[in-house]
Amino acid sequence: MDCEIRPAHEQDADAISRLIIAALQTSNAQDYPAAVIAQVRQNFSPHAVRQLLSKRQVWVAQAAGEIVGTASLDGQVVRSVFVAPERQGQGVGRQLMAELERQALSAGITQLTVPSSITAEGFYANLGFRTLREQYHGEERTLIMQRELDQTTHNL
């Protein structure tokens, strides 16, 4: 599925929040207890998303006028990559990651790190990320993954 990848705007916050919460409740809920999902969900209220928009570089994937994915870059750290549950497996996440990589390379960043959920571990591994270590926040298990960027082969 080809999407338009564009920078997120403040007026996208509600749609981004809905998308992330739907992905958490549908996809991530298969790998994490309900209490963890409820805790993580609080980080993505419309208000919280608006705050993130002022702190990070956030992009959205849009198809037919609808936001179907989001991802952000915080320096060299990839954060909050989510795709609408009904669009997962259609290349939306890969397109978002390609844009993050382009942005990182243009900023002189040569390595990306991602604190991955166990749900997304396979996705990142398929993009060439390798697991460095595990990290726990209470019951939430996160995998710290990393990938070297290559200026000549930056199309995922």
Q: What does each model-found stretch correspond to?
A:
Residues 78-88:
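A short, internal acetyl-CoA/4′-phosphopantetheine-binding micro-motif in the GNAT/acyltransferase core
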Residues 94, 118-144:
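Conserved active-site alpha-helix within GNAT-family acetyltransferase domains
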Residues 89-102, 126:
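Conserved acetyl-CoA-binding loop-helix of GNAT-fold acetyltransferases
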Residues 44-60, 77:
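A short helix-loop-beta-strand connector motif used in the catalytic cores of GNAT acetyltransferases and
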Residues 1-14, 150-156:
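Conserved N-terminal entry element of GNAT/NAT acetyltransferase domains
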Residues 104-117:
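Conserved GNAT acetyl-CoA-binding A-motif
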Residues 17, 21-47:
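Conserved GNAT-fold acetyl-CoA-binding loop/helix
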Residues 57-69:
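Conserved beta-hairpin
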